[in-house]
Amino acid sequence: MYPVSEAFLQAVQGNTRKYYWTGKITTAGGVEYLFDQEDIVKGSGYITAQCCGNSEIELGAVYAAEMGISLFLDIDRYTLEEAEVELSYHLRLADGTYEVVPMGIFEVSEANRTVHVLELKAYDRMLRFDRAFNGFETIGTAYGMMALCSTACGVELAQTQAEIEALPNGSELLSVYPESF
């Protein structure tokens, strides 16, 4: 979870709140397009998270987030192949200042264009873990295995080795065998 201030927690619990969204689209070529609440089609944005692709529990499933948004931006949709979208939520606190919370980085999977609107659908980097395991036998700590998987999938590991080792079984040796998959 992202750490927020006590003032943020109080503001989010209020009956009414003033907030806005901003974001940045970065193309594979490094071109950046900034957008704010004026560029977002009202009521078009969403972020949802789902664990499994169906109604059954699956071993190894992770929560993956989907983001959708419609923007009044004049961007060629074909330039958005392999682009990333960063979203930020700005909440007004009791003292009148705004606290910013990053809502994630999403990889564009669909970009559709109408005359005035660009519609984006994107997924977070957890989908990078949806790949075949190479089947070798391995023994290691939880952190070692997490670091191995994160590096192989190109995803930054959010926890430090010390944080993982502080967990109840964080320093235990674990085994993975090919026939488990």
Locate each region found by the language model.
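Assembly/oligomerization scaffold segments
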Residues: 1-137
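Charged- and aromatic-enriched interaction segments used to assemble
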Residues: 112-181
